[in-house]
From Swiss-Prot:
Keyword Hydrolase: yes
Function field: Cleaves peptides in various proteins in a process that requires ATP hydrolysis. Has a chymotrypsin-like activity. Plays a major role in the degradation of misfolded proteins.
Protein name, as recorded: ATP-dependent Clp protease proteolytic subunit
Database matches in InterPro entries: ClpP (IPR001907), ClpP/crotonase-like_dom_sf (IPR029045), ClpP/TepA (IPR023562), ClpP_His_AS (IPR033135), ClpP_Ser_AS (IPR018215)
Catalytic residues as annotated in Swiss-Prot or TrEMBL: 109, 134
Length: 205
């Protein structure tokens, strides 16, 4: 997780299209819009403002569609900006639907934090997924007094993130502080034992 205001431009790529045939004719969707109809949201790549805004908007839209049905958040992310990630986190906690989280590939840093923040009992990973937790990183430059101000702020952020992680994982704050002092990598089995996820899914139930 990084404590910075840096903007990362969206990496545009070719998005597959799917065609549905109905009595009224054919309708085409990009694959992510079609999956959104199934209440599936993808969080892939670095967490930054543009991506976070899209995910937040999708969650609010799905809540308006049906506040009783689960939302499924698929995560494959190396982490990213803390404030961007916290906008997703706060929305997950705010909306009425349960948010079931899935890790495919990796969930590192803010990705792991959001994975753990899913509804208890509905947090999953695939067998070869990798998780990583650590403390926030900062890279502020400026006058000495400003650096001191930002250093105090990042320590406050670190403590708050650790408190939330402890709540969702079910460990003490002291354990989380110790375990996130350096990069801590977890395999699927280790993530279950640690409490980051609730189960490993090797096939659809």
């Amino acid at each position: 997780m990084s404590y910075s205001c840096e903007y990362t431009p969206l990496n545009m790529a070719l998005v597959p299209m799917v065609v549905e045939r109905t009595l009224r004719g054919e309708r085409s969707y990009d694959i992510f819009s079609r999956l959104l109809k199934e209440r599936i949201i993808f969080m892939t790549g670095k967490v930054e403002d543009y991506m976070a805004n899209i995910i937040v908007a999708q969650m609010i839209f799905l809540e308006a569609e049906n506040p009783e049905k689960d939302i499924y958040l698929y995560i494959n992310s190396p982490g990213g900006n803390i404030t961007s990630g916290m906008s997703i986190y706060d929305t997950m906690q705010f909306i009425k639907p349960n948010v079931s989280t899935f890790c495919m590939g990796q969930a590192a840093s803010m990705g792991a934090f959001l994975l753990a923040a899913g509804t208890k009992g509905k947090r999953f990973c695939l067998p070869n997924a990798r998780m990583m937790i650590h403390q926030p990183m900062g890279g502020f430059q400026g006058q000495a007094t400003d650096i001191q101000i930002h250093a105090k702020e990042i320590l406050k952020v670190k403590n708050r993130m650790n408190e939330l992680m402890a709540k969702h994982i079910g460990k003490t704050l002291q354990v989380i502080e110790q375990d996130t002092e350096r990069d801590r990598f977890l395999s699927a089995n280790e993530a279950v034992d640690y409490g980051l996820v609730d189960a490993i899914l090797s096939h659809r139930i």
